[in-house]
C-alpha cells in the first residue's frame, strides 16, 4: 500500500474512531448537521418563524461539540478512567442543553422594540456563545499538550492547525466530488433535481470533516504513549520552510515598517486614521504572537532572530499604539473599536512581557489570558455592549450639562446654537447610543433622537456630523431577497372617495395627513419603522384609533408566493401589489410601486422596503 492510500485510510479510520473517543462531541456535531438539513428543507416563509429556535439549537450544539472536546481531553489526560470519561460526556451534553435553555429564554431580541417580525438571537447572546466556544477550544489545546514529556503548548497548537487543514482539505474534496456527481445526475438523468441537494452534500461534507478533525488527534489517555502523537505534532519540511523562510521575514519587514512609523510619529505627530492603525496593529500583535508560538522549536537563523527581536519590537510599537489610543479616546470617547483594541493591546503587552520573562513556558499563560479577555468582553457591566455605551452616555451627559441642555434628568433644547465641535460631539454620541443594543440607557434618553426631526425638536439644532477618518462600507456577503415591481396596468378604484399620495405624507414632519369626511376629520399615518421597515398604517377619527395594522400578514402573503431568492426583480400584478384593509368606519386599499425584501443569511436579518404609490379610502 503506497503512502498516499495509507494516509487516506488512516484519516477515515480516525474519523470512525472519533465516535468512540469523543462521543458527545460527535453527537453534537451530528445534531448540528440535522438542524442544518431541516433548515435547508424549509423555505424562508416556513423557516422565518422558526429562525430563532434553529439559531439557538445551532449555537447550543456548537458549544456542546467544542466543550465536549475539551472536557473529554481533560478527563483522558488527567484521570483516564471510565467514570471520568462518562462524566465528561455528560458535561458536554449538559453544556449544549444549558446553552440552549439560556439562549432560548434570555438570548432573544424583542420584536416589538427592534422592529422585527420575530425574535432573533441577540448579538450579545451570540457573542457569549462564541466566547464559550473559543475558551473551550483553547482549553482543549492546553490539555492536548500534556504530559510535558511528550508535548507542550506549541506542539499542541500546531497539531490543532494541522488537524483543521487536513479535515478542511478532505471536506472540500468530498463536497467537490459529491457535487460533481450530483451535477452529472442533474444534467444527464434528472434535470428537475432540487438545488437543495448541493446544500445537503455541503452539510454532510462538513460533518464528515469534523469527524476527521476530531479523529486526527492521538490517544490522550494518561499513561499511554501513542506513536501517532509524534507524527501529528511534527511540522513537515515544507511548513518549516513556510514559517522560517517566508512568514518570519514578512513579519520582520512589517516590524521594521511599524518601527519607522513610530519614529516618524515622534517627529510629525499622529496622522494615521485610528481605524486603519488599530486594524494593522491588532493584526500585527495577534499574528506576531501566533507566529512566535509556531516557530518555538525552529532552529533556522531567521526563526531564532525573530524569537529574540519580536518581543522588544512589539513593546515599542505597542507603546506608540497606546499613544494613538489615548488621542482617540480624548477625541471620541470609548466605542466598540477602541474597546476591542484596548483588550487586544492589554493581551499583547502581557504576552510579550511573558515571552521575555518565561520564553516558551509563557504560552499556556498567554492562552489563559486570552480566555480571560474573551470572557471579560461579554460580561454584564464590562462587556463590549455595556462599557462603551456607558462611556458615551457619560460623555453626552457632560456635553449637555455644559450647554444647559440637561437639567433634573430632562432634556431641554439649546437656546443658542452650540459651537461646531460641540454639535459634532453631541451628534456623534447620540447616534452611537441610539444604535446600541443590549445596554441599559438612562430614562432621559430617547432612541428616536437618531431621527433628524426628533433630534432638532429636543436638542434645538440639526444633526452635525464630524468629518469621518475613513469610509468603510462592505456587505458581509450573500444575498437572498424578493424584489417586485408593479406591472403597468389600470387600477379599479370605483367606490373609493379619496386618493392619498405618499408624498403628501412624507412631506410632513410628523408623517400625518388629514382628510375631512362625513364622520369628521381622519388622520392618516404611514410609519416605515426603521431600521427594518415593516410599515404600519394607523388611521384616527378625531382622537380615536379606528384602524391600526402593520404589513406582516401582507408580507407573509408575498413571501409565500415569491420566496426570497437570488434572482433579480419580478413584475407583479395589481392583485399582488395591493392590499385591502377594513375597519367599521372605513375601507382602505394600499397600492405599492415596488417591494424589496432582503435577507442577510449570515446575521439572520431580514429588512423590508415597501414603496407606497397611493392610498385609497372610502367611508362605510
Predicted regions and their residues:
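Hydrophobic alpha-helical segments
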Residues: 240, 244, 254-327
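Extracytosolic and intramembrane catalytic regions of membrane-associated proteins
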Residues: 407-620
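N-terminal signal-anchor module of multipass membrane proteins
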Residues: 1-100
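Hydrophobic alpha-helical transmembrane segments in integral membrane proteins
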Residues: 377-403
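Membrane-embedded alpha-helical segments of integral membrane proteins
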Residues: 177, 307-358
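Membrane-interface helix-loop-helix junctions at boundaries between adjacent transmembrane segments
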Residues: 48-49, 78-88, 102-241
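Internal/C-terminal transmembrane anchor helices
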Residues: 361-384
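Membrane-helix interface and helix-disruption motif detector
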Residues: 39-59, 78-84, 106-130, 187-200, ...
Amino acid at each position: 500500500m503506497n503512502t498516499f492510500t495509507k494516509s487516506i485510510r488512516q484519516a477515515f479510520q480516525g474519523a470512525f474512531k472519533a465516535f468512540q473517543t469523543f462521543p458527545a462531541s460527535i453527537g453534537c456535531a451530528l445534531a448540528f448537521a440535522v438542524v442544518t438539513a431541516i433548515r435547508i428543507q424549509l423555505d424562508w416563509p416556513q423557516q422565518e418563524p422558526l429562525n430563532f429556535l434553529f439559531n439557538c439549537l445551532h449555537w447550543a450544539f456548537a458549544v456542546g461539540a467544542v466543550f465536549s472536546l475539551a472536557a473529554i481531553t481533560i478527563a483522558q489526560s488527567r484521570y483516564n478512567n471510565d467514570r471520568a470519561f462518562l462524566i465528561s460526556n455528560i458535561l458536554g451534553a449538559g453544556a449544549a442543553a444549558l446553552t440552549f435553555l439560556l439562549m432560548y429564554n434570555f438570548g432573544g431580541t424583542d420584536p416589538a422594540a427592534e422592529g422585527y417580525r420575530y425574535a432573533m438571537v441577540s448579538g450579545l447572546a451570540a457573542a457569549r456563545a462564541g466566547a464559550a466556544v473559543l475558551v473551550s477550544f483553547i482549553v482543549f489545546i492546553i490539555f492536548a499538550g500534556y504530559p510535558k514529556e511528550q508535548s507542550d503548548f506549541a506542539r499542541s497548537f500546531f497539531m490543532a492547525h494541522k488537524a483543521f487543514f487536513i479535515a478542511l482539505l478532505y471536506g472540500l474534496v468530498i463536497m467537490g466530488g459529491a457535487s460533481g456527481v450530483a451535477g452529472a445526475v442533474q444534467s444527464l438523468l434528472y434535470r428537475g433535481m432540487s438545488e437543495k441537494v448541493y446544500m445537503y452534500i455541503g452539510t454532510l461534507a462538513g460533518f464528515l470533516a469534523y469527524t476527521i478533525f476530531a479523529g486526527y488527534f492521538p490517544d490522550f489517555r494518561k499513561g499511554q504513549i501513542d506513536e501517532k502523537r509524534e507524527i501529528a505534532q511534527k511540522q513537515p519540511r515544507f511548513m518549516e520552510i513556510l514559517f522560517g523562510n517566508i512568514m518570519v521575514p514578512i513579519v520582520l519587514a512589517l516590524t521594521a515598517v511599524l518601527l519607522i512609523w513610530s519614529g516618524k510619529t515622534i517627529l510629525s505627530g499622529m496622522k494615521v486614521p485610528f481605524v486603519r492603525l488599530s486594524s494593522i496593529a491588532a493584526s500585527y500583535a495577534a499574528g506576531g504572537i501566533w507566529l512566535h508560538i509556531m516557530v518555538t522549536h525552529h532552529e533556522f537563523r531567521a526563526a531564532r532572530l525573530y524569537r529574540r527581536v519580536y518581543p522588544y519590537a512589539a513593546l515599542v510599537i505597542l507603546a506608540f499604539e497606546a499613544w494613538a489610543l489615548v488621542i482617540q479616546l480624548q477625541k471620541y470617547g470609548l466605542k466598540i473599536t477602541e474597546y476591542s483594541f484596548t483588550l487586544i493591546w492589554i493581551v499583547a503587552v502581557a504576552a510579550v512581557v511573558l515571552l521575555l520573562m518565561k520564553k516558551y513556558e509563557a504560552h499556556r499563560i498567554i492562552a489563559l489570558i486570552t480566555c480571560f479577555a474573551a470572557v471579560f468582553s461579554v460580561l454584564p457591566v464590562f462587556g463590549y455592549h455595556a462599557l462603551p455605551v456607558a462611556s458615551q452616555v457619560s460623555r453626552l451627559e457632560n456635553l449637555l450639562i455644559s450647554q444647559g441642555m440637561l437639567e433634573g434628568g430632562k432634556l431641554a433644547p439649546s437656546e443658542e446654537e452650540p459651537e461646531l465641535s460641540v454639535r459634532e460631539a453631541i451628534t456623534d454620541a447620540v447616534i452611537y447610543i441610539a444604535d446600541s443594543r443590549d445596554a441599559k440607557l438612562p430614562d432621559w434618553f430617547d432612541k428616536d433622537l437618531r431621527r433628524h426631526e426628533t433630534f432638532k425638536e429636543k436638542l434645538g439644532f440639526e444633526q452635525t456630523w464630524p468629518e469621518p477618518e475613513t469610509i468603510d462600507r462592505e456587505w458581509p456577503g450573500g444575498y437572498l431577497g424578493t424584489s417586485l415591481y408593479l406591472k403597468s396596468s389600470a387600477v379599479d378604484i370605483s367606490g373609493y372617495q379619496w386618493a392619498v399620495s405618499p408624498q403628501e405624507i412624507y412631506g410632513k414632519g410628523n408623517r400625518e395627513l388629514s382628510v375631512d369626511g362625513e364622520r369628521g376629520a381622519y388622520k392618516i399615518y404611514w410609519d416605515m419603522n426603521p431600521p427594518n421597515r415593516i410599515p404600519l398604517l394607523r388611521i384616527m377619527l378625531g382622537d380615536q384609533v379606528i384602524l391600526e395594522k402593520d404589513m406582516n400578514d401582507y408580507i407573509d402573503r408575498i413571501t409565500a408566493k415569491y420566496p426570497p431568492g437570488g434572482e433579480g426583480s419580478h413584475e407583479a400584478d395589481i392583485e399582488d401589489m395591493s392590499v385591502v384593509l377594513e375597519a367599521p368606519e372605513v375601507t382602505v386599499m394600499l397600492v405599492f410601486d415596488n417591494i424589496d425584501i432582503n435577507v442577510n443569511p449570515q446575521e439572520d436579518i431580514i429588512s423590508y422596503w415597501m414603496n407606497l404609490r397611493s392610498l385609497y379610502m372610502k367611508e362605510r
